[in-house]
Design a protein with these regions (language model features):
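Glycine-rich/acidic phosphate-handling loop/turn and adjacent ATP-lid/helix
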Residues: 78-109
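Conserved short strand/loop->alpha-helix "switch" segment adjacent to the catalytic nucleotide/phosphoryl-transfer site
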Residues: 5, 28-47
Length: 143
């Protein structure tokens, strides 16, 4: 499957699409990223990987009838990349002092902290919302 012109991002998205498909998780993608990006390609792929990995893991712990992952990613203007990943979840989201705690082990979750750090390093931002069984992460990376 081909999702976008940027080969690195396309590979990441395709990998997680294949995993979701294998697990029968509905996976929606709206992505428009050109071959050449105004933002760091490695950082963009790290953000995509972290968010999609988290979404896949949360979906696997969600009742099969409610599972879904939705990815939206595109450029805004000449220097911003906007990424949003939504997924359903069952259970309790654990957060302490603005830091999400890992659902896999004791302590902080590394993935979302990494995403926040990458966004801030590029003078961007990341936000997380969760309500009524829907978890949403929005990331803005600046070039």
């Amino acid at each position: 499957m081909h999702f976008c012109e940027n080969r690195a991002a396309d590979s990441v998205v395709g990998y997680y699409c294949a995993l979701a498909k294998r697990e029968n998780i509905p996976y929606s993608v709206q992505i428009d990223l050109p071959e050449c990006l105004p933002v760091d390609e490695i950082n963009l792929c790290l953000v995509l990987s972290n968010l999609l990995e988290n979404a896949l893991e949360a979906s696997l712990r969600t009742a099969p009838a409610r599972r879904r992952i939705k990815l939206t990613a595109y450029l805004h203007g000449n220097s911003l990349a906007l990424i949003q990943v939504e997924n359903t979840y069952d259970g309790v989201i654990r957060e302490k002092d603005g830091v999400f705690l890992s659902s896999k082990r004791k302590g902080d979750g590394v993935g979302l902290q990494s995403v926040r750090h990458i966004a801030e390093k590029s003078c961007g931002v990341s936000t997380v919302t969760y309500q009524d069984g829907l978890f949403c992460v929005k990331v803005m990376l600046c070039g």
